[in-house]
């Protein structure tokens, strides 16, 4: 029989009594020299870190990415250098608008943030369960997220401000259509697709760049929750998706996704009739078919939620040689915003935490800061250039190829492309009658109580996408088409 562990303070000395505070006599006041009590209360006061401003409610798991098809003609990234090669991963799912204690069965996009622990460093693809987003320009992101949160005065959610924003943002229509479709409430995290959403880039050994979209196709099959079931679960089991994911992995029913890409050459992008870097639109799979890359499997639950899920930090700025960014405006905004959020929320040295630490060597000149641990660079120099032969040196061979740009610096109107409607209309026409009816009823229910001016403005967008789309919602809302 194993020996019992001795309880200690955070500094290591043993604790003699964890039941009774020190006091002046059995009925007297407590004593300030009870360092165990003081430490315990002080640490308790500081247990929470700021929750994520978005994607606060989340679940995570470790897994493995396995290469199934050769794509070395597109990328020199070493994790893809041979078929069958495996790379450890960590995947965090989430809702977007809700707080940490909210239900994970709400109608909301789901975050799909994937970290690859590669031999060249960490690579993150920070996506969602939808291929598009509500806005094109990160300048509008704080405004949009405010509409998904709570009113400043009452601290209540508001359909009015949500639809008011969308009715002034016609580019949101494609994502709105997806959100209120049957896929707007996935049945847990295992039964939904994932997407990188943004356009990224791949760079091969010749220095050639291709634009890429990432897709994760669930092998468990798509399953969604009916609104009534989702509402019931929100009251009876608000952690339904977390429970489902954790339980499946614990019993060995490991969820898997088929990983695919779409590829577009730079020449194709330059000549394309649509902006391939517009995250409110998808690429045609007829024009740019899916190419299988590999398989993602989740096979290990975290041992501690706070340490490994709450403190997990993902960012599109985490890249390895052979992958890169694109002129996608939202992606470029996220490159700053995500890393900055982690510095505020988790700390300056968040990359040193085990869940965020790369499995490859780290050789940088960054030093000190809050909660720096390990050797902190030891006695090595903390400046560059320097005269030390064994100090880290830049590696020009990993430079990305030049990207040709044109145009004067200005604030260009990102709404000059006025086609906000064709993609939403095409999606509506792909739906069967049952799916269309569900979409219309979901939207009409969500618009109940919204002011008539907002309803009228939003209805115009539905009509422009497809007359039947607009007519159905107008009828469900009891709005006269006259």
Swiss-Prot record:
It is an enzyme of class 1 (oxidoreductase). Heme binds at residue 338. Residues 1-28, 370-395 are annotated as: Disordered. GO terms for biological process: hydrogen peroxide catabolic process; response to hydrogen peroxide. GO terms for cellular component: cytoplasm. PANTHER family: CATALASE. This is Catalase. It comes from Onchocerca volvulus endobacterium.
């Amino acid at each position: 029989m194993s020996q019992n562990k001795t309880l200690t303070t955070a500094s290591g000395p043993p604790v003699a009594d964890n039941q009774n505070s020190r006091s002046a006599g059995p009925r007297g006041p407590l004593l300030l020299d009870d360092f165990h009590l003081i430490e315990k209360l002080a640490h308790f006061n500081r247990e929470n870190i700021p929750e994520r401003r978005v994607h606060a409610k989340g679940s995570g798991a470790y897994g493995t990415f396995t290469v199934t098809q050769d794509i070395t003609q597109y990328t020199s990234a070493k994790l893809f250098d041979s078929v069958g090669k495996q790379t450890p991963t960590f995947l965090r799912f989430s809702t977007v608008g809700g707080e940490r204690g909210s239900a994970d069965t709400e109608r909301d996009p789901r975050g799909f943030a994937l970290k690859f622990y590669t031999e060249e460093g960490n690579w993150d693809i920070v996506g969602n369960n939808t291929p598009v987003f509500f806005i094109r320009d990160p300048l509008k992101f704080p405004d949009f997220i405010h509409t998904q949160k709570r009113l400043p005065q009452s601290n209540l959610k508001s359909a009015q401000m949500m639809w008011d924003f969308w009715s002034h943002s016609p580019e949101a229509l494609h994502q709105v259509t997806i959100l209120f479709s049957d896929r707007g409430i996935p049945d847990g995290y295992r039964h939904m697709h994932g997407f990188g959403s943004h356009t990224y880039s791949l760079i091969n050994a010749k220095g050639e760049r291709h634009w890429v979209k990432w897709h994760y196709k669930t092998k468990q099959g798509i399953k969604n929750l009916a609104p009534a079931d989702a509402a019931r679960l929100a009251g009876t089991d608000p952690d339904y998706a977390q429970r489902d994911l954790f339980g499946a992995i614990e019993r060995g029913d490991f969820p898997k996704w088929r990983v695919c890409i779409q590829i577009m050459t730079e020449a194709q992008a330059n000549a394309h009739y649509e902006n391939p870097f517009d995250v409110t639109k998808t690429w045609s799979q007829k024009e740019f078919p899916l190419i299988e890359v590999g398989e993602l499997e989740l096979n290990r639950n975290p041992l501690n939620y706070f340490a490994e899920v709450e403190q997990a930090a993902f960012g599109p700025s985490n890249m390895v040689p052979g992958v890169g960014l694109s002129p996608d405006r939202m992606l470029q905004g996220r490159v700053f915003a995500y890393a900055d959020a982690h510095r505020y929320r988790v700390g300056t040295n968040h990359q040193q935490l085990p869940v965020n630490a790369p499995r490859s060597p780290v050789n940088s000149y960054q030093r000190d800061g809050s909660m720096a641990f390990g050797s902190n660079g030891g006695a090595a120099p903390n400046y560059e250039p320097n005269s030390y032969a064994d100090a880290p040196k830049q590696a020009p061979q990993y430079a990305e190829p030049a990207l040709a740009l044109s145009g004067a610096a200005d604030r260009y109107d990102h709404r000059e492309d006025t086609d906000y409607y064709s993609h939403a209309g095409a999606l509506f026409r792909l739906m069967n009658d049952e799916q269309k009816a569900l979409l219309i009823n979901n939207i009409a229910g969500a618009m109940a109580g919204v002011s008539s001016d907002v309803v009228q403005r939003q209805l115009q967008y539905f009509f422009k996408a497809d007359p039947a789309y607009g007519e159905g919602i107008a009828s469900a809302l009891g709005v006269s088409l006259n």
